[in-house]
Amino acid sequence: MTKRTFGGTSRKRKRVSGFRVRMRTHTGRSVIRSRRKKGRSRIAV
């Protein structure tokens, strides 16, 4: 059997796609807006 190679790093995940990073740019804010509009329980990581 092969190993699961993807571990996942919380710090990197937050830095790349966290809420504060999204709010920095216009497109990021639009992402948050659209996810709120859709009714996602998690708008950002």
Curated annotation (Swiss-Prot):
GO terms for cellular component: ribonucleoprotein complex; ribosome. It comes from the Bacteria. Residues 1-45 are annotated as: Disordered. Signal peptide: none annotated. Pfam families: Ribosomal_L34. One of its GO terms (biological process) is translation. Residues 10-45 have a biased composition (Basic residues). The keyword Iron-sulfur does not apply. The keyword Transcription does not apply. Keywords: Ribonucleoprotein, Ribosomal protein. One of its GO terms (molecular function) is structural constituent of ribosome. Transmembrane segments: none annotated. HAMAP family: Ribosomal_bL34 (MF_00391). Belongs to the bacterial ribosomal protein bL34 family. This is Large ribosomal subunit protein bL34.
